[in-house]
């Protein structure tokens, strides 16, 4: 059977050259304008930008403006940064403008390439978002490329974690904005929780360029962005369960490392029932009794925490806080927590403060966030291996851009050992061999724990080195920039794969130019930077990123991977008969082997993992699309009301729907059930606005009279508000109430869907498709949400009474009475900010109702 991944890869190779040939014709046009643009004065460039904007407004499109725009950016870069865009960068710029992915090797100048498409698309004056992998790069790239944009007459800015809303809004209103994917996503969610358009910071989603697009859309696709609030505190339960779980033995559970799952055996279930019954936690002496569902969930999470999640690999504990480590990048994911109670289970395991669970207020995945943009493009050094996923999920085509200079890096065949100990010994010997000559070495490991193991082995050999991992990443950029120095030895996790070029001889400016050049030539003669991979990662793309640190822009360099059969990849996904194959090939203890059979086995193992992860992401997206469609409806309705000048029309429409529904129930109320439903809903709606006698009379009215009665009650309450406030303020009250009703009901709805997702998989045991079942249930819940939202909104409006604030004459005596009281908050907390709900000892009232009301 044809492997679809292989087919796609072959298709890309055959079609890629055709695409490059087509784009090269555009590059020729750009080059033909270079001489004329060179004759422009500095003052002419902003004028040219204005001319291009005018042409766009007069009917020309961006494609026709591209050659002149790119020529202007190239010349502006030469004058401001002394950097001229190479033809391959012009190629990449065209690919980005066309909404595709440009695969460009490390060191080929992706940041400069992005400036071309960013400038062209900024001419629309609708904003361009450039996505970077961290805050440091957002600020750096904005400032460096900002020199070009400013010269051309464009505005630019960046978004960082410590900015307030005013600063964020200002930066989003610039022509070009640099930000991380998480900042963009969270700002979108927060904007859809605001109460006025003026409070929102983003202005739309038109065009985005994602730097290191594979990291954002592939690696982080499974991680949703979540804004959460405090939920019920179950701290003691987590601690109690953790204590009891430690009493289980290995025969009480089975571990599935492939799917990262753990299941209790029959013996384990019996043991759990005894342990938890003795502790008084289990109900009805049956672990799987419906009343113990919460307990089952917490036990499973505690088991996963103890046996599937490893400190130093999946997380670290720093300053008493448990922090997640990204499995692919090796970075700490600041501010993120494992969901579904797993984070609390890990905190209990590590005996640190267990923080309360959070309830989701709003969430979105990166997959669905980036689908908000009219056009998306990106660049990376490693996209071809994931081309099928990019096309299938995002409809993005990958175009492989040739290097400016020929790639001369040597990628040696993998060295395979039987045991990890033999492999480690060989790695240290290789480091010693290269280090004696002064050749710079970059050693890649899969986790913090592994990096510390190799550090200890090098310390034993008295080799000076630097360890770079999530524990000590503060000087990452500086360390990596100088990784090309003589005698440099750096041990790192995948953290050092992005954003910073390694220059042979050292970072420019770190030493005199002549000394730098001399050192560079020495290192070239030694073979350049030597990259050592201590094992194959689960993704070929991550391996390629490691290789890509060497051999930038035609420099010398080399790479090699050392592999053992005890490595996680081979142990979990490799063939069980691999050891027998090595024995047949005559591999002796301590020896390595390089053989096509082994390389094929490694490739198959990685493809298994890649295919499995792709399926997981595809499946998650199918489920998330259900929530995404509902999110779109809710956010659209919310924004519609928030931005509307005719909020009364929304209220009247909802009232009309509710009355029609009640009349429908009224005509069916022959049955006791329908009668109760009608009475309950009508009582809820009218609340305290009618007494029992009037309520009875309303239920007996004919349909038209019934409708008029409810309408009159609603309008009576509204007119009272208008009389006391004025019409504009009354509209603002209705608008604010509606937005709060949406937020409250949406929050509950998300929680219901999360709970549904956790259990829907069980439907497969009844020969039902979990996805189909989830869609049905989610649709039913969404219908209920919309109905409840309207009922809550109209009910509040009918029953809402505006209370007149105390007049000036009533307030003054209070001030006089308390102004000299030493317990008065205004005196006790002079010049300090006082909470509106803080109790004032002078009056016994909340601050907002006494001194704070003055």
Curated annotation (Swiss-Prot):
EC id? 7.4.2.8
**Which gene is annotated as encoding this protein in its UniProt record?**
secA
The record gives the membrane topology as: Peripheral membrane protein
Q: Where is the signal peptide?
A: none
In which family does this protein belong, per the annotation? Answer: Belongs to the SecA family.
The name of this protein is Protein translocase subunit SecA
* SMART domains on file: HELICc (SM00490), SecA_DEAD (SM00957), SecA_PP_bind (SM00958)
**UniProt cross-references to Pfam families, sorted A to Z:** P-loop_SecA, SecA_DEAD, SecA_PP_bind, SecA_SW
């Amino acid at each position: 059977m044809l492997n679809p991944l292989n087919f796609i890869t072959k298709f890309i190779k055959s079609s890629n050259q055709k695409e490059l040939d087509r784009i090269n014709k555009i590059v020729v046009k750009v080059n033909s304008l270079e001489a004329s643009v060179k004759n422009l004065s500095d003052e002419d460039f902003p004028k040219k930008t204005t001319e291009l904007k005018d042409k766009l407004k007069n009917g020309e499109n961006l494609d026709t403006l591209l050659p002149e725009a790119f020529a202007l950016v190239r010349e502006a870069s030469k004058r401001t940064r002394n950097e001229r865009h190479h033809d391959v960068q012009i190629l990449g710029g065209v690919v980005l403008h066309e909404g595709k992915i440009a695969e460009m090797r490390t060191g080929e100048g992706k940041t400069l390439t992005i400036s071309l498409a960013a400038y062209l698309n900024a001419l629309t004056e609708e904003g361009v978002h450039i996505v970077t992998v961290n805050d440091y790069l957002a600020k750096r790239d904005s400032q460096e490329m900002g020199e070009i944009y400013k010269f051309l007459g464009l505005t630019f800015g960046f978004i960082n974690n410590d900015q307030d809303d005013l600063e964020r809004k200002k930066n989003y209103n610039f022509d070009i904005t640099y930000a991380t994917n998480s900042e963009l996503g969270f700002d979108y969610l927060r904007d859809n929780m605001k109460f006025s358009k003026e409070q929102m910071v983003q202005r739309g989603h038109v065009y985005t360029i994602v730097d290191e697009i594979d990291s954002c859309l592939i690696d982080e696709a499974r991680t949703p962005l979540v804004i959460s609030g405090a939920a019920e505190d179950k701290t003691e339960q987590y601690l109690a369960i953790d204590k009891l779980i430690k009493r289980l033995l290995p025969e009480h559970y089975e571990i599935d490392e492939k799917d990262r799952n753990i299941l209790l055996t029959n013996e384990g279930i019996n043991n759990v029932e005894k342990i938890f019954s003795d502790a008084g936690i289990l109900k009805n002496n049956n672990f799987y009794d419906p009343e113990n569902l919460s307990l089952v969930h917490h036990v499973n999470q505690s088991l996963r925490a103890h046996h599937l999640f490893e400190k130093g690999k999946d997380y670290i504990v720093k300053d008493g806080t448990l922090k997640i480590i990204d499995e692919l990048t090796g970075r700490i994911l600041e501010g993120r927590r494992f969901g579904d109670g797993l984070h609390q289970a890990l905190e209990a395991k590590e005996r640190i403060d267990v923080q309360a669970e959070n309830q989701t207020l709003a969430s979105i995945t990166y997959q669905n966030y980036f689908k908000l943009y009219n056009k998306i493009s990106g660049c990376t050094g490693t996209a071809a291996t994931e081309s099928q996923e990019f096309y299938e999920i995002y409809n993005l085509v990958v175009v492989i851009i040739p290097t400016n200079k020929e790639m001369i890096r040597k990628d040696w065949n993998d060295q395979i050992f039987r045991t990890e100990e033999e492999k480690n010994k060989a790695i240290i010997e290789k480091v010693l061999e290269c280090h004696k000559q002064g050749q710079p070495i970059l050693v890649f490991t899969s986790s913090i724990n592994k990096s510390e193991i190799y550090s200890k082995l090098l310390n034993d050999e008295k080799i000076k080195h630097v360890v770079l991992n999530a524990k000590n990443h503060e000087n990452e950029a500086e360390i990596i920039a100088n990784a090309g120095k003589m005698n440099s030895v750096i041990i790192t996790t995948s953290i050092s794969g992005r954003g910073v070029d390694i220059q042979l001889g050292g970072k420019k400016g770190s030493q005199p130019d002549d000394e730098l050049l001399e050192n560079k030539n020495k290192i070239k003669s030694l073979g350049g930077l030597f990259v050592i991979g201590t094992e194959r990662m689960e993704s070929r793309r991550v391996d390629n990123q490691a290789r890509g640190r060497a051999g930038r822009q035609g420099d010398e360099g080399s790479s090699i991977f050392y592999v053992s059969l005890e490595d996680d990849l081979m142990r979990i996904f490799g063939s069980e008969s691999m050891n027998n194959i090595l024995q047949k090939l005559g591999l002796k203890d301590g020896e390595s082997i390089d053989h096509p059979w082994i390389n094929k086995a490694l490739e198959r193992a990685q493809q298994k993992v890649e295919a499995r992860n792709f399926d997981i992401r595809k499946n998650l997206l199918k489920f998330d699309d259900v929530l995404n469609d509902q999110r779109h409806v809710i956010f659209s309705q919310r924004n519609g009301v928030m931005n509307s000048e005719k909020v009364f029309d929304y209220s009247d429409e909802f009232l009309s729907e509710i009355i029609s529904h009640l009349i429908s129930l009224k005509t069916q109320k022959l049955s006791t059930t329908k009668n109760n439903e009608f009475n309950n809903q009508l009582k809820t709606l009218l609340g305290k606005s009618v007494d029992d006698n009037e309520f009875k009379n309303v239920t007996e009215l004919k349909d038209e009279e019934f409708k008029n009665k409810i309408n009159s009650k609603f309008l009576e309450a509204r007119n009272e508000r208008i009389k006391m406030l004025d019409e504009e303020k009354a509209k603002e009250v209705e608008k604010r109430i509606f937005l709060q009703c949406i937020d409250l009901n949406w929050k509950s709805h998300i929680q219901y869907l999360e709970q549904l997702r956790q259990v829907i998989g069980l439907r497969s045991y009844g020969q039902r498709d979990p996805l189909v079942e989830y869609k049905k249930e989610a649709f039913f819940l969404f219908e209920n949400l919309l109905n409840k939202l309207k009922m809550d909104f109209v009910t509040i409006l009918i029953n809402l009474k505006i209370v007149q604030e105390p007049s000036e004459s009533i307030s003054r005596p209070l001030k006089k009475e308390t102004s000299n009281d030493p317990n008065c908050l205004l005196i006790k907390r002079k010049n300090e900010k006082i909470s509106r709900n803080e109790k004032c000892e002078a009056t016994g009232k909340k601050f907002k109702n006494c001194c704070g009301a003055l």
